[in-house]
Amino acid sequence: MVIAVGKDVHVFLMRLTLPDRPGSLGSVATAMGSVGADINAVEIVEKTTDGSVVDDFIVDLPPNQLPETIVTACQNLAGVRVEWIARYPEGGGLQSDLEALERMTADPPHAAETLVSLCPVVFRSHWATLIDASENIPRSSYSTTLAPDLTPEIAARFAPFDTTHRIDLESDWSPGWGDTTAVVTPLTQDRVIVIGRLGGPAFLDSEIARLHHLAALVK
């Protein structure tokens, strides 16, 4: 489980694994409410083969509550596991793939850049970047605000660029950066998108499949 907090941030994104049966979501909502949390949004991320479901929650916590309190409240429930909790921009929402697609098709010449800019919200990544490998010297051509600076040498670490894959990067893979998990997927013959999470958790197979699908729609 990953916990990332900020003193002036009281909106959190939580990812939970819970039993896929009637009443589970209600029990989680009751547990969250018991510590003063308000649920703003819920989204099903993945249903697993073992009878569990992975859900994302956006919750408000009162200023006097630490995120550990809601983690404990949820994990006291049978079969519930908190995968991670992280600060979230106030007013942010759980943006769907369909909304991302609509924005991409509204401006086809810049569909790749649009997808990159939306990835931190749609896929709960900390950053995203567009890598151009057209001249055998990979370089970042467009990035979100929190993305690392990628020299050609660092960008080359995300190869191969012709297939979708995960990559785990050790601390200091880029100056000042800690352990990072990332996904690489081709956009066009010469361009790929990379999304990353500092400190994890690893991207689920369903998230990778969704990213691959959206990337395939970039012309």
Question: What do the predicted segments below correspond to?
Answer:
Residues V2-A106, L118:
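A conserved regulatory-domain signal marking ACT and ACT-like small-molecule sensing domains
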Residues D60, G200-P201:
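Short strand->helix junction
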Residues C74, A78, L115-F123, A215-V218:
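Hydrophobic, Leu/Ile/Phe/Ala-enriched alpha-helical segments that form helix-helix packing faces
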Residues D97-D132:
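Amphipathic alpha-helical coiled-coil segments that mediate homodimerization
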Residues I131-G196:
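GAF sensory domains
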Residues I195-G199, R210:
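Extended, charged low-complexity segments
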Residues F203-K219:
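Amphipathic alpha-helical "output/dimerization" segments
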